Regions:
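Carbohydrate-interacting regions of secretory-pathway proteins
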Residues: 19-219
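Bacterial N-terminal signal peptides
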Residues: 5-15
């Protein structure tokens, strides 16, 4: 029995690694940026089809009632050192969402779209904060003097995340909201996937567009 369990575990790990390897990145533009969302469909992404869809050139996450806890739209390609940008908006200023980076995918019961790791948080009172989903909780609060000026309540906001070595920086609309040098040798993440969060219990809509990434040298 243990032998078959080991074989099954190996097969699942192999399938997961193959899925990551099969996610092909587009060619970078002249400035080194690669587009992760083509504006037409969810190619390269994986998530609950009851929650995620593409409308009018943006990704929409919406459901009346979400069962099984938070769910995520996952880009199954690990990244280490990079600058990541995405435009986002919470329709009607309702709900809670975030952008996962250097994260890991896991499962919780029937919910296979569970992600743990660094999250560039956003929602009422949450914009700009660094939260570790499924881990240490809040790692860095938004600079208090920046909180009133960083977001547009009813418009698109540009989130910019820079991760290089042990240091991460988050910006909203050009304003730095947090800077962290994560020196926790056991828990700090150096590499991982990118994902978009839809927070339980639902009953709101979050939108994302213009998602792009630029890879950085380690040093």
């Amino acid at each position: 029995m243990k032998f078959f369990a080991t074989i099954l575990s190996f097969a699942l790990i192999t399938a997961s690694l193959s899925a990551q390897e099969d996610t092909k990145l587009p060619k970078p533009d002249a400035d080194g940026w690669m587009t992760l969302f083509n504006g037409k469909d969810l190619a390269g992404w994986d998530g609950d089809p009851k929650v995620w869809r593409v409308k009018d050139g943006y990704i929409s996450g919406a459901i009346e009632k979400l069962e099984g806890g938070n769910t995520f739209l996952v880009f199954k390609k690990p990244f280490s050192n990079f600058v990541l940008e995405a435009e986002c908006v919470l329709v009607g200023r309702k709900g809670n969402s975030g952008i996962q980076y250097r994260s890991k995918q896991s499962e919780r019961g029937a919910n296979k779209w569970v992600v743990k790791g660094y999250q560039a948080d956003f929602g009422n009172g949450l914009w700009g904060k660094l939260y570790e989903e499924g881990g240490r909780g809040v790692l860095a609060f938004t600079y208090k003097d920046k909180a009133p000026e960083i977001k547009k309540d009813d418009g698109w906001n540009t989130y910019r995340i820079t991760a290089k070595g042990s240091k991460v920086t988050q910006e909203i609309n050009g304003t730095v909201t947090i800077e962290l040098d994560d020196q926790d040798e056991k828990k700090a993440a150096k590499e991982g996937i990118i994902a978009l969060q839809y927070h339980s219990p639902g009953d709101f809509e979050v939108r994302f567009k213009n998602i792009r990434i630029k890879l950085l040298e380690a040093k």
